[in-house]
Amino acid sequence: MYPKAADEGAQPLATGIPFSGGGGYYQAGGAMAAAFAVQAQAPVAAWSTGLCNCFDDCHNCCVTCVCPCITFGQTAEIIDRGSTSCGTSGALYALVMLLTGCQCVYSCFYRAKMRAQYGLQVSPCSDCCVHCCCQCCALCQEYRELKKRGFDMSIGWHANMERQGRAAAAVPPHMHPGMTR
């Protein structure tokens, strides 16, 4: 009725349930526990620029102070990996800002999402506190961080991915030198 223990060198039975490596037997929760253990030990890196280093990119600082929805839209598109466009995110930010004045609550979730994606530390205080107290500085810091990670913020997610794909295709593979005399 029950299968015998797997012999040494024999293939395990295909059950559709991932094995966790415990001698060929499925251990309940083993795969999930391992996945969560890896996530919990993610390295925490410092931000590449400080919160108050807005003048490192004067153009972005001016744009953000005059119309923060533009900077938010650009960063949100990259953080969402292209699932929402810059225009959509920026318009939603502007709508929340005009209707409620609580755009900081909306934007702090994107800061938290960005920190999770790139393993950034909570600094100098919680995401919501940073966005509620220093909205423009927080948006500028997120923009600079993505820019320093190689994103061209003016072209969006899909164009950045296309550009990275072309750059990878243009680099020839490394060839090991052959036999020499």
From Swiss-Prot:
- Tissues in which the protein is found: Expressed in leaves, stalks and tassel spikelets. Detected in roots, apical meristems and immature ears, but not in pollen. In leaves, not detected in the cell division zone, expressed at low levels in the cell expansion and transition zones and at high levels in the mature or fully grown tissue.
Q: What UniProt keywords apply to this chain's record, in alphabetical order?
A: Membrane, Transmembrane, Transmembrane helix
- The membrane-spanning stretches of this chain are 88-110
Its placement in the membrane is given as:
Single-pass membrane protein
Q: Which GO CC terms are listed, alphabetically?
A: membrane
InterPro entries on file:
PLAC_motif_containing (IPR006461)
Q: Which GO terms describe its biological process?
A: negative regulation of cell population proliferation
| Localization (cell) | Membrane
Q: Pfam families annotated for this entry?
A: PLAC8 (PF04749)
Please give the family membership noted in the entry: Belongs to the cornifelin family.
Q: What does this protein do?
A: May act as a negative regulator of cell number.
User: What is the designated name of this protein?
Assistant: Cell number regulator 2
Taxonomic lineage of this organism?
Answer: Eukaryota, Viridiplantae, Streptophyta, Embryophyta, Tracheophyta
